[in-house]
């Protein structure tokens, strides 16, 4: 009886280690989003911050024209993908119900090749993102929070 269960246990254990390709792809797009747009605890949030972060995140070959870093915690950003902190915006996007601290880095200077120079703009904004399977996968824009009149 024990020998009969051995192959089943082996198949079960091996099955636990296999990740369906769609889940692996979703996770990689989310990780790419975090690499490009997430920085929990920024330092400075000035031009030097932008130049350092853009280089550190490999966004300078060629120099990316504009990139925004969202500050705070990952859970709050994920919540934009749900009704907890987000609502539909346009055709395929979600806009945050609450504002986030963000730093937008804009490339200044002529050449699209390193060394890249960036100008920083920081502030509190609502973010617009695309989500797949409850995870942010694309940063679209940040907008000033509209106040009710």
From Swiss-Prot:
Q: Which residues form the signal peptide?
A: 1-24
GO MF: actin binding; copper ion binding; DNA binding; endonuclease activity; heparin binding; protein homodimerization activity; RNA nuclease activity; signaling receptor binding
Task: Report the activity regulation comment.
Answer: Has weak tRNA ribonuclease activity by itself due to partial autoinhibition by its C-terminus, which folds into a short alpha-helix that partially occludes the substrate-binding site. In absence of stress, the ribonuclease activity is inhibited by RNH1 in the cytoplasm. In response to stress, dissociates from RNH1 in the cytoplasm and associates with cytoplasmic ribosomes with vacant A-sites: ribosomes directly activate the tRNA ribonuclease activity of ANG by refolding the C-terminal alpha-helix. In response to stress, the angiogenic activity of ANG is inhibited by RNH1 in the nucleus.
Q: Which residues hold tRNA? A: 45, 105, 127
Q: Name any one Pfam family assigned in the record.
A: RnaseA
Checking CDD domains in the record gives: RNase_A_canonical
List S-S links within the chain.
50-105, 63-116, 81-131
Do you know which SMART domains this protein is assigned to? RNAse_Pc
GO biological process terms on file = actin filament polymerization; angiogenesis; antibacterial humoral response; antimicrobial humoral immune response mediated by antimicrobial peptide; defense response to Gram-positive bacterium; hematopoietic stem cell proliferation; innate immune response; negative regulation of apoptotic process
Q: What is its EC number?
A: 3.1.27.-
**What stretch of residues is annotated with the motif Nucleolar localization signal?**
55-59
Residues bearing Pyrrolidone carboxylic acid?
Answer: 25
Q: Which Gene3D superfamilies match?
A: Ribonuclease A-like domain
The active-site annotation reads 37, 138
Q: What is its main location?
A: secreted
* UniProt-listed InterPro entries: RNaseA, RNaseA-like_dom_sf, RNaseA_AS, RNaseA_domain
Q: Give UniProt keywords alphabetically.
A: Angiogenesis, Cytoplasm, Developmental protein, Differentiation, Disulfide bond, DNA-binding, Endonuclease, Hydrolase, Nuclease, Nucleus, Protein synthesis inhibitor, Pyrrolidone carboxylic acid, Secreted, Signal, Stress response
Q: Which GO terms describe its cellular component?
A: angiogenin-PRI complex; basement membrane; cytoplasm; cytoplasmic stress granule; endocytic vesicle; extracellular space; nucleolus; nucleus
Instruction: Give the subcellular location.
Output: Secreted; Nucleus; Nucleus, Nucleolus; Cytoplasm, Stress granule
Domain of life assignment: Eukaryota
Q: Which SUPFAM superfamilies match?
A: RNase A-like
Under the subunit heading, UniProt states: Homodimer. Interacts with RNH1; inhibiting ANG ribonuclease activity. Interacts with PCNA.
Q: What does this protein do?
A: Secreted ribonuclease that can either promote or restrict cell proliferation of target cells, depending on the context. Endocytosed in target cells via its receptor PLXNB2 and translocates to the cytoplasm or nucleus. Under stress conditions, localizes to the cytoplasm and promotes the assembly of stress granules (SGs): specifically cleaves a subset of tRNAs within anticodon loops to produce tRNA-derived stress-induced fragments (tiRNAs), resulting in translation repression and inhibition of cell proliferation. tiRNas also prevent formation of apoptosome, thereby promoting cell survival.
Please give the family membership noted in the entry.
Answer: Belongs to the pancreatic ribonuclease family.
| Name of the protein | Angiogenin
Q: Its gene? A: ANG
């Amino acid at each position: 009886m024990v020998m009969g269960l051995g192959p089943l246990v082996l198949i079960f254990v091996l099955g636990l280690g296999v990740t369906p390709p769609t889940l692996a792809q979703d996770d990689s797009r989310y990780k790419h989003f975090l690499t490009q747009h997430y920085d929990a605890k920024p330092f400075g949030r000035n031009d030097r911050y932008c130049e350092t972060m853009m280089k550190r995140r490999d966004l300078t070959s060629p120099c990316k024209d504009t990139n925004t870093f969202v500050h705070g915690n990952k859970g709050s950003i994920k919540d934009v993908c749900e009704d907890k902190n987000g609502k539909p915006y346009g055709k395929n996007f979600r806009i945050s119900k609450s504002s986030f601290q963000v730093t937008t880095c804009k490339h200044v200077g002529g050449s699209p090749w390193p060394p890249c120079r960036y100008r920083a703009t920081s502030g509190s904004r609502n973010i617009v993102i695309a989500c797949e399977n409850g995870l942010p996968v694309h940063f679209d824009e940040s907008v000033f929070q509209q106040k009710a009149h």
